[in-house]
C-alpha cells in the first residue's frame, strides 16, 4: 500500500509529532511505501525518515511568514495560535500546504492519506482530494480548538463528516467527535496508542533494585553531571513546562511531600515556547527544598534513560487523551501518576489492568483545560496523595503493556478487518 501522511506541525516535540514519526517507522518495517508532508521552521534541520519521501513545508519563510501553527496555545517551541490567524495568513497556510500535498499526490500516487488532527489542514486536504481515501486521527487538541474558538468551524465540521474513517485514542474522544463534528459513529474507531518497545524497556545493565523492578543505577544529566540512585524516590515529569500540563501544581505538591520528610528528587524533561511561563516555572523551582533537575527537551533515546532511572512518572495534565509518555514510562518500569482525565482510568483498566497507575482527581474544569484558582489546593493535595500511594506501592512484577505497540496499531490501520 502507498501511504501519504500529513501533519501541519513539526514531526517531533509533541505527542502528535511522535505519533506520526512512529507510524512512519512501523509502516516502513511492514514494507509499506510512504511519503509525508509536515511543517518545519525555517533553518531547521530536515529530519530523515528511512524509506519515506518527504515534502516539508517551511514556516517563517517568504511563502509562509509566521511561526509553526500549534494545536495547543502554548507549544514547546515558538508557534502561532490558530485563533490569531488573519485571512491573509489563512490563505498563505492553505496555499503552502496544499501545494506540497498536490505535489506529493501527483508524484507519489498514494492509495491512502493519513491526516493528523481533525482540524483545518485535514479539512483542506479532504476538499482538495475528494476522490481519495482519507483517514483522520484525533489527537484531542483538535477537539479543544473546536470548542475554544470558531475559526472555520462550519467548514471543518462539514469536511470531517466527509472523511472515510476517523481514529480516536479512546471512547471519550469518540463520543466527543460525534458530539462536536456530527460524524457517523460507524466511521469512528478507537485505536488506542502505542509505544516503541525497542526503545522503552527496563534497564538491562547497571541495575539497581529497590522493589522487584530493576532501575538504572546512574544517569548523566545534559550538563555532564552524573546522578546515582540512593535513598530518594526519583520523580520524572516529561512534557511541556506549562500550567496546563500541571507543572506548577506538581512543584507545589512535591514541596509538600518534602516538607513532610519524604526524600524525593524531581527531574523535569521538556520546554515551553512561552518564555514568561517558562521563567515562572524556574522561579517557583528556586524556592524548592528538594532537588530539581531541569533537563530541557530530550531526544527520545535520551529520555528512555531517564525513564529507566526514575521510580515514578508524574503527569498531572489538565487536558489530554492518552499520554504517550505514560505508556513509555510503564514499559520502562515506572509507577505512574496521572490526573483523572475523561475515560483514562477505563482505558488502562481495559488495556493493562495490572499497571501501577495512580490517579489524582481533577476538579470541574472551565473551558475544558482551565482550572479555577480556588480549586488548585484540592488538586495539589490529590497529586500529593497519588504520589504517596505510588511511593508506598510494592511493585514486584512488571505490568504487561505489550498489546499497546505501534506495530499492532499500524496493522489495524492497514488491515480493516482488524477493526
Positions of PLM-derived features:
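A conserved mid-protein helix/loop that constitutes part of the nucleotide-sugar donor-binding site
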Residues: 18, 233, 242-256
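A conserved catalytic-core segment of Leloir-type glycosyltransferases
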Residues: 41-100
Amino acid at each position: 500500500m502507498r501511504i501519504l501522511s500529513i501533519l501541519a506541525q513539526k514531526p517531533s516535540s509533541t505527542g502528535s509529532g511522535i505519533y506520526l514519526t512512529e507510524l512512519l517507522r512501523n509502516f516502513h518495517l511492514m514494507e509499506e511505501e510512504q511519503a509525508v508532508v509536515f511543517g518545519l521552521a525555517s533553518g531547521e534541520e530536515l529530519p530523515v525518515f528511512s524509506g519515506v519521501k518527504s515534502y516539508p513545508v517551511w514556516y517563517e519563510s517568504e511563502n509562509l511568514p509566521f511561526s509553526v501553527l500549534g494545536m495547543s496555545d502554548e507549544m514547546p517551541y515558538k508557534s502561532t495560535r490558530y485563533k490569531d490567524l488573519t485571512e491573509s495568513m489563512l490563505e498563505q497556510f492553505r496555499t503552502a500546504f496544499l501545494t506540497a500535498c498536490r505535489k506529493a499526490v501527483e508524484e507519489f500516487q498514494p492509495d491512502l492519506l493519513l491526516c493528523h488532527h481533525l482540524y483545518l489542514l485535514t479539512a483542506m486536504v479532504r476538499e482538495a482530494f475528494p476522490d481519495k481515501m482519507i483517514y483522520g486521527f484525533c489527537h484531542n487538541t483538535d477537539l479543544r480548538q473546536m470548542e475554544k474558538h470558531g475559526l472555520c468551524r462550519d467548514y471543518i465540521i462539514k469536511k470531517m463528516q466527509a472523511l472515510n474513517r476517523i481514529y480516536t485514542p479512546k471512547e471519550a474522544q469518540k463520543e466527543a467527535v460525534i458530539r462536536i463534528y456530527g460524524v457517523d459513529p460507524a466511521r469512528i474507531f478507537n485505536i488506542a496508542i502505542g509505544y516503541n518497545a525497542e526503545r522503552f524497556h527496563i534497564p538491562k545493565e547497571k541495575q539497581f533494585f529497590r522493589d522487584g523492578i530493576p532501575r538504572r543505577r546512574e544517569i548523566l544529566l545534559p550538563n555532564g553531571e552524573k546522578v546515582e540512585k540512593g535513598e530518594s524516590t526519583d520523580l520524572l515529569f516529561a512534557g511541556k513546562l506549562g500550567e496546563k500540563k500541571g507543572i506548577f501544581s506538581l512543584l507545589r505538591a512535591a514541596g509538600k511531600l518534602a516538607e513532610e520528610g519524604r526524600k524525593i528528587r524531581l527531574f523535569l524533561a521538556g520546554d515551553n515556547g512561552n518564555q514568561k511561563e517558562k521563567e515562572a516555572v524556574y522561579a517557583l523551582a528556586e524556592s524548592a527544598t528538594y532537588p530539581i533537575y531541569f533537563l530541557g527537551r530530550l531526544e527520545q533515546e535520551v529520555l528512555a534513560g531517564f525513564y529507566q532511572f526514575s521510580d515514578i512518572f508524574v503527569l498531572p495534565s489538565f487536558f489530554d487523551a492518552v499520554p504517550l509518555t505514560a505508556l513509555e514510562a510503564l514499559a520502562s518500569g515506572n509507577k505512574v501518576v496521572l490526573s483523572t482525565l475523561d475515560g483514562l482510568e477505563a482505558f488502562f483498566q481495559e488495556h493493562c489492568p495490572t499497571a501501577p497507575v495512580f490517579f489524582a482527581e481533577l476538579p470541574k474544569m472551565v473551558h475544558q483545560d482551565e482550572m479555577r484558582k480556588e480549586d488548585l489546593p484540592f488538586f495539589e493535595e490529590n497529586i500529593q496523595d497519588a504520589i504517596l500511594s505510588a511511593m508506598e506501592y510494592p511493585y514486584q512484577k512488571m505490568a504487561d503493556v505489550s498489546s499497546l505497540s505501534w506495530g499492532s496499531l499500524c496493522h489495524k490501520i492497514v488491515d480493516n478487518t482488524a477493526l
